Amino acid sequence: MLLGSHVSMSGKEMLLGSSKEALSYGANTFMIYTGAPQNTRRKAIADLNIMNGRLHMKEHGMTNIVVHAPYIINIGNTEKPETFRLGVDFLQSEIERTAALEATQIVLHPGAHVGAGADAGIAKIIEGLNEVLSQDYPVQIALETMAGKGTECGRSFEELAKIIDGVTHNERLSVCFDTCHTHDAGYNIVEDFDGVLNEFDKLIGVDRIKVLHINDSKNVRGAAKDRHENIGFGHIGFDALNYVVHHPQLMAIPKILETPFVPLASDAKSKSAPYKAEIEMLRSSTFKPELIEALKG
């Protein structure tokens, strides 16, 4: 089973540091941003320490790593041409960096229509993806299932299907299935994950799922809020998430935790990563809330 988390990529070690961090959590895969998700400042590809990072990954069985595109990309924006243009150009450069890292999946929030309506936003996303995918790289864009917060597009399987169907080179598109987002969008993954997966299969095809984001949710189903919670501590719950992680149709897919860091009881500003504990729980199929509580000190 491929199970890991979001890790940082920074400093001099860059990819090597990412692999070391993932190893410390007991992971065998991981997800990274190639720089800060809030801006376009990026180190040169030559400074990502790729060779040493890949060597460490090989030595420790790290495979199927995933890149996440930055939040600032919004190719669904019909109101500001400069925002759309930045999104297309920067996504193309991020795909180039993803290929250099030898990752095959870059996760993308499809975009927000900023008031123009979902149909207009989806049309703009299709336009942007058609331009981005005109350049050939061995990388798929994994469109993420969204919670429906604000004017997000991709809040339903139907919206994602419409985007995929409209893109010319849609063999270069995949899907990142986020448990928190899907739950918050209204899908009953707690009581009927197989039914949800069957619905996805009919509209898009389960074979399109190439990344799973495994997150609990702070919100009730259908809240359209997108607030992640630690595994077993939210409205989805451990049993449902454990079922997803061990689902026979999804075994070969990298599963990435994006759960919140745990604040210390003595100092809320100091926080600990929960990933080692959560990976241990999911690998053993045993909910151990005391592991998370222990992180509070």
From Swiss-Prot:
Positions with a binding annotation for Zn(2+) 3: 181, 226, 228
Chain residues that bind Zn(2+) 2: 144, 178, 213, 258
Gene3D superfamilies xrefs: Divalent-metal-dependent TIM barrel enzymes
Pfam families per UniProt: AP_endonuc_2
GO biological process: base-excision repair
Cofactor note: Binds 3 Zn(2+) ions.
Molecular functions (GO terms): deoxyribonuclease IV (phage-T4-induced) activity; DNA binding; DNA-(apurinic or apyrimidinic site) endonuclease activity; phosphoric diester hydrolase activity; zinc ion binding
CDD domains, per the entry: AP2Ec
Catalytic reaction annotation: Endonucleolytic cleavage to 5'-phosphooligonucleotide end-products
EC number, UniProt record: 3.1.21.2
Cofactor(s), names only, from the UniProt record: Zn(2+)
Residues annotated to bind Zn(2+) 1: 68, 109, 144
Alphabetical list of InterPro entries matching this protein: AP_endonuc_2 (IPR001719), AP_endonuc_F2_Zn_BS (IPR018246), Xyl_isomerase-like_sf (IPR036237), Xyl_isomerase-like_TIM-brl (IPR013022)
Superkingdom of origin: Bacteria
SMART domains per UniProt: AP2Ec (SM00518)
Keywords, sorted A to Z: DNA damage, DNA repair, Endonuclease, Hydrolase, Metal-binding, Nuclease, Zinc
Family: Belongs to the AP endonuclease 2 family.
HAMAP family the UniProt entry points to: Nfo (MF_00152)
NCBIfam families (alphabetical): nfo (TIGR00587), PRK01060.1-1 (NF002196)
Function: Endonuclease IV plays a role in DNA repair. It cleaves phosphodiester bonds at apurinic or apyrimidinic (AP) sites, generating a 3'-hydroxyl group and a 5'-terminal sugar phosphate.
PANTHER family the UniProt entry points to: APURINIC-APYRIMIDINIC ENDONUCLEASE (PTHR21445:SF0), ENDONUCLEASE IV ENDODEOXYRIBONUCLEASE IV (PTHR21445)
Identification of the protein by name: Probable endonuclease 4
Organism: Lysinibacillus sphaericus (strain C3-41)
Lineage: Bacteria, Bacillati, Bacillota, Bacilli, Bacillales
